[in-house]
A protein has these predicted regions:
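Nucleotidyltransferase catalytic core that binds NTPs
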Residues: 1-144
Length: 144
């Protein structure tokens, strides 16, 4: 995605939100990684020229209003959604490019996979621990 975006511009600025649950608790997920960890990952990407960190949607709007840029990249899922700064971009001649999401990766899906793997690991450990006890002792406690 960042590679494709970089091919469409000379200088790629990426906005990194500290925690989307600040403005939208219950709607967005809290990041599993710290803002520093996510920043370092973006910094390591050869397509990213600058990283702009923001906390709230108001901060994002202020970034949009004060930064110089000619194209804004959004995922196609936001095409018919009134996202922060969209109208400002339209009013000020900033092209909005909607990129296709050709993959199924999502932070929610990754969280669910990790949860299921950890759950299976815990269940396996419980079964291992139970197997060390005699069946009669187990039966005594299982009947209760």
């Amino acid at each position: 995605m960042l590679k494709m975006e970089k091919e469409l511009c000379d200088y790629l600025k990426v906005a990194l939100q500290v925690d989307p649950t600040i403005d939208r608790p219950g709607v967005k997920n809290k990041p599993a990684q710290s803002v520093y960890e996510r920043y370092v990952q973006l910094q390591a990407c050869k397509y990213v020229d600058e990283i702009l960190v923001y906390e709230t949607e108001l901060d994002l709007l202020n970034l949009i209003k004060t930064q110089t840029f000619h194209i804004r990249f959004l995922s196609e899922e936001y095409k018919d959604v009134d996202v922060t700064g969209k109208q400002y971009c339209i009013d000020h001649g900033v092209e909005i490019h909607y990129h296709l999401r050709r993959h199924t990766y999502s932070s929610t899906e990754i969280r669910n996979r990790v949860y299921e793997l950890e759950k299976a690991k815990r269940e396996e450990k419980i079964e291992e621990n139970l197997s060390q006890y005699s069946p009669k002792l187990l039966d005594k406690y299982m009947d209760k």
